[in-house]
């Protein structure tokens, strides 16, 4: 697990073994930037922190920066953890499959013609299937499952020009329900990410790139007691564009992002009434 590996490095700590968040140089986990090729991933964890969001077999490497004080770094006061995709165009079909006691994952690399390739990966947990009969609390049935999917397409138009399309989707579902009635609590959360990057290499030390992206995180808590139901959904969505030029040690770039934030939307209902209270916010960053 990439997030678990970082916790073994100097200057990086975690609160407990059941926390996939990292605390770099004493900063809170929420102060770090976690992303894929410069695109942020919010709340990057599964199973309340036991698993991280990233399927390691889908990526080529991981970059870690403990001191993000460069102008090109994201606007965070903590560190940076960034997953990097494969640079090369795959020329043959290969992949891997891993089966564990809690989850399994698989990855497939395949060429699409001479100048294009695709990478697919998926991961899923099967706690309910194997351990469902043991997951009970005071007569209530406890259920949990997660899955995530990665997609990457690369194509070389010319010798030094490449198009990279990347997508990620992850989903978690947990619930605790009474066995003899419909009372219970449900919690769902997940991420979605899509990005497109066009990069041209002038030489080994000079390149220019343009990227557009969308990333979002959603969370929804629901509970029901007799004839009363309540839910607390929240979400954050970001749309951005970034462009950069690199020449040896010189980097010049521009980035803009639009954030849509919905902290909470309380909703209560009974058999006869329903109430909605909505809070929304927008933020622009450049």
Predicted features and spans:
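Predominantly transmembrane beta-strands of Gram-negative outer membrane beta-barrel pores used
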Residues: 33, 61-72, 78-86, 93-140, ...
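Structural signature of outer-membrane beta-barrel domains
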Residues: 29, 39-41, 86, 102, ...
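Transmembrane beta-barrel architecture of outer-membrane proteins
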Residues: 1, 19, 49, 59, ...
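Face-selective signature of the C-terminal outer-membrane beta-barrel domain
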Residues: 151-172, 188-286
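Outer-membrane beta-barrel proteins
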Residues: 90-95, 102, 130-152, 181-191, ...
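Periplasmic N-terminal accessory/gating domains of Gram-negative outer-membrane beta-barrel systems
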Residues: 1-69, 80, 86
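Strand-connecting loop/turn motifs
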Residues: 31, 57, 90-92, 113-117, ...
């Amino acid at each position: 697990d990439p997030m678990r590996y970082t916790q073994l490095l100097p200057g990086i700590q975690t609160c407990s073994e059941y926390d996939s968040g990292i605390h770099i140089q004493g900063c809170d986990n929420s102060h770090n930037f976690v992303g894929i090729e410069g695109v942020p991933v919010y709340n990057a964890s599964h199973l309340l922190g036991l698993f991280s969001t990233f399927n390691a077999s889908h990526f080529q490497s991981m970059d870690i920066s403990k001191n993000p004080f460069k102008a090109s770094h994201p606007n965070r006061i903590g560190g940076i953890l960034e997953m990097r995709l494969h640079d090369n165009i795959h020329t043959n079909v290969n992949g891997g499959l891993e089966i564990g006691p809690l989850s399994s994952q698989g990855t497939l690399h395949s060429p699409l013609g001479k100048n294009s390739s695709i990478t697919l990966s998926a991961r899923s947990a099967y706690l309910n299937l194997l351990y469902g009969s043991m997951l009970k609390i005071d007569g209530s049935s406890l259920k949990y499952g997660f899955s995530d999917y990665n997609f990457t397409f690369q194509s070389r138009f010319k010798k030094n020009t490449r198009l990279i399309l990347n997508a990620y989707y992850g989903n978690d579902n947990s619930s605790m329900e009474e066995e003899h009635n419909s009372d219970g609590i449900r919690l769902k959360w997940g991420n979605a990410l899509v990005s497109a990057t066009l990069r041209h290499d002038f030489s080994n030390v000079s390149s220019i790139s343009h990227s557009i992206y969308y990333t979002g995180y959603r969370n929804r808590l629901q509970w029901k007691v007799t004839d009363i139901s309540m839910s607390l959904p929240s979400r954050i969505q970001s749309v951005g564009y970034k462009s950069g030029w690199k020449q040896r040690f010189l980097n010049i770039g521009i980035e803009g992002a639009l954030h849509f934030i919905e902290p909470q939307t309380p909703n209560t209902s009974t058999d006869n009434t329903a109430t909605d209270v909505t809070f929304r916010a927008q933020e622009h960053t450049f």
